Structures are given as structure tokens and as C-alpha cells.
């Protein structure tokens, strides 16, 4: 088994995680927005590694489970045996992509744009996460505290990670709606669990939470005798604002051009495997949650509840090119550094 292999078990979600009986504090870099995150290098158990195996990497959040499903159920492994590993931080991902240690990985979609604009020979293959973010709010008299962005602007809100994906998405949506985000009552935390604690304590009215943290919030609130809800679906808000499907092209599988040249048959089979994995996860949420719970520091119950709201996908990036470029354009307008100084051209997208 790889030196990266770890199994994580969560015992206390009030801002700490328990890992092999050792307490580790969440750190900002170890959690990816879209998305939200786990902390430490992990390896999903597919096959014993050997020098000839390929390695597919993923973030420490639920979409990486699709790689594990594909490894167990799919046909690509019969063409080239492969191992699935989890990068523990954006820094590890970037270093691996730059030094060649990582040639195939699920990445935040803006990372693909940034690398491409730096002149790196990479292609965005597909979109595997269409967004995981929700606005949690209390319920009073059968109604959620907020029902629109305009409502949200009148209440206090906690967001994990200042100037990271959840924050950036909301800033763009406020701007599109003609709302002044700088005037909003926003608090930031260094970790998602801290945002959850702040919200459940009643110190803020609402919280911007990714799955499966949103589902965990619902479970914890119920334990405390409180009623909360997914008051706003950030993906739905994005679709309405930009006249697209109710999704955000948050993360996808990236390949280096060298990997593509050497593994064309494998990639074609993997494409079908991942599409099948999406369907399998929807048909088998409990089994998917059981698999995810072995590697992500969340209770299986929260994972099972959150997976149906996690918007897994395996959409070819080139097939929604315009939608992704719109996403990049908005990110670039907010902060040009996010996309590497410019909006990438269509050469970023993989085409067979």
C-alpha cells in the first residue's frame, strides 16, 4: 500500500478532526472550495501499486469517489491498471503538475485555466463537479429566514475561506444582482467546520456551506432541536444569473498532453467509466457514501445525505465550452490572477 494511504475517522466536527487518534486542525490550504475538503494525502485502495501503473489524482472531496468507483467497476483498468490518490493541498497539486509527478488529476477548473495561461501543456478533459455550495439558514414559522440574494444581503453570513471559491462565487452573484457585497455583513473563517460551528451557535444568521458540510449541518441542527434548511442553492442562483443550467463548472479532470499521447485508449475507456460511475453513485448512494467515508473525514450519514446534492458529473469540457468560458470570464473580471492573467482560449479543452 502506498505511503500516501491513510484512513480518517471524524469524532468531533466542532472545528477539529480526529485522524488515527491524533488531532489535527484544519488548515486553509487543505480545503478546496468548490468544494470544500479533507486533509492529508490519501490513497483509494484500487490495486497494489507497481511501477507500470498509472495514477489518477483527486481532491479531498466527494467527486474523487467517482475515480474509485471507476477503478472498481470500470473497464479502463483492463487497458492500464491504475491507482487513485488524493492530493492533500493545492500546493501539492500545483507542485506535482509542474514537476511532472501528477499528470492526471481532478482540479478546480480555474486551476486548469491558470496553468494553461502559464504555457503549461495541459487539457481540461471534463467537468466532474457542477457545484456543491448552499446557503444554510434557520427556519421560523415554516419559512426560511432568506429566500433570495436580496434577503441574504440583509442578514449576517459566514463564509469559509476569504477570496476562495465559495466567496468568489457569491461576490460575482451579488455584483450580477446589483447588490453591494462590500456592504454585506460577512464573516470569514479559516476552515469550513469553524463556519459550521459559528452558524449553529447562532452567532451569525446564515452560512455558505459546501456538501457534505451542509448535510452535516442539518444533522447537527436536528440533534440540537433546531430547524435549518438549504435556503439558497448557489448553483441555481448561478444558472438564473447567467441563463445557463443550474450548475457551476467547478472542477474537472485535467491531463497533461504527454499523458494524453501515451494513453489514448485508456482515456476513451475512462470517459465511459466515469459516466457510468455517476449513474452508479446515483443508484447506490449508500454504497457510495460507505466508500467515501473510508477516506473523507465526515460521518457516513452526512455523506449519504450530501451525495445526492453534490452534483456529480462527467461532462466533456469541450461540449460546454461557452459555459466554462463564461465562468472564467467572470472569475477573471473579479481577479485576473485567478485565471493566470487572461481568459483562456478554446485550446484548453480536450478533444479526441
Model-derived features: positions:
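N-terminal export signals
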Residues: 30-48
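Short, solvent-exposed loop/beta-turn-alpha elements that line the ligand-binding surface or hinge
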Residues: 78-80, 144, 238-246, 313-321
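Pocket-lining segment of extracytoplasmic ligand-binding domains
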Residues: 110, 194-291
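Short, glycine-/small- and polar/acidic-enriched structural segments
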Residues: 49-180, 186-187, 205-211, 228-232
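Secretory targeting signals
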Residues: 1-26
Amino acid at each position: 500500500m502506498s505511503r500516501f494511504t491513510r484512513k480518517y475517522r471524524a469524532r468531533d466536527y466542532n472545528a477539529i478532526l480526529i485522524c488515527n487518534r491524533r488531532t489535527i486542525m484544519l488548515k486553509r490550504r487543505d480545503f478546496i472550495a468548490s468544494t470544500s475538503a479533507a486533509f492529508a494525502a490519501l490513497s483509494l485502495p484500487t490495486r497494489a501499486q507497481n511501477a507500470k501503473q498509472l495514477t489518477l489524482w483527486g481532491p479531498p472531496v466527494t467527486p474523487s469517489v467517482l475515480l474509485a468507483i471507476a477503478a472498481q467497476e470500470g473497464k479502463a483498468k483492463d487497458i492500464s491498471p491504475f491507482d487513485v490518490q488524493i492530493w492533500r493541498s493545492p500546493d501539492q497539486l500545483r507542485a506535482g503538475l509542474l514537476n511532472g509527478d501528477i499528470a492526471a488529476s481532478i482540479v478546480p477548473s480555474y486551476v486548469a485555466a491558470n496553468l494553461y495561461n502559464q504555457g503549461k501543456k495541459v487539457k481540461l478533459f471534463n467537468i466532474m463537479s457542477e457545484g456543491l455550495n448552499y446557503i444554510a439558514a434557520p427556519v421560523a414559522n415554516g419559512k426560511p429566514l432568506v429566500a433570495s440574494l436580496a434577503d441574504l444581503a440583509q442578514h449576517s453570513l459566514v463564509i469559509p475561506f476569504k477570496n476562495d471559491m465559495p466567496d468568489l462565487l457569491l461576490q460575482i452573484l451579488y455584483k450580477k444582482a446589483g447588490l453591494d457585497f462590500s456592504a454585506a455583513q460577512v464573516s470569514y473563517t479559516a476552515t469550513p467546520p469553524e463556519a459550521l460551528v459559528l452558524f449553529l451557535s447562532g452567532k451569525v444568521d446564515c452560512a455558505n456551506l459546501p456538501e457534505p458540510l451542509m448535510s452535516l449541518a442539518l444533522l447537527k441542527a436536528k440533534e440540537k432541536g433546531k430547524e435549518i434548511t438549504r435556503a439558497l442553492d448557489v448553483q441555481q442562483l448561478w444558472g438564473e444569473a447567467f441563463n445557463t443550467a443550474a450548475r457551476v463548472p467547478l472542477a474537472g479532470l485535467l491531463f497533461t498532453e504527454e499523458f494524453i499521447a501515451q494513453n489514448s485508449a485508456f482515456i476513451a475507456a475512462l470517459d465511459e467509466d466515469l459516466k457510468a460511475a455517476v449513474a452508479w453513485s446515483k443508484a447506490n448512494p449508500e454504497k457510495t457514501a460507505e466508500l467515501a467515508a473510508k477516506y473523507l473525514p465526515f460521518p457516513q450519514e452526512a455523506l449519504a445525505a450530501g451525495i445526492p446534492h453534490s452534483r456529480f458529473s462527467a461532462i466533456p469540457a469541450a461540449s460546454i465550452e461557452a459555459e466554462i468560458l463564461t465562468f472564467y470570464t467572470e472569475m477573471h473580471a473579479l481577479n485576473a490572477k485567478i485565471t493566470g492573467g487572461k481568459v483562456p482560449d478554446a485550446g484548453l479543452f480536450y478533444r479526441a
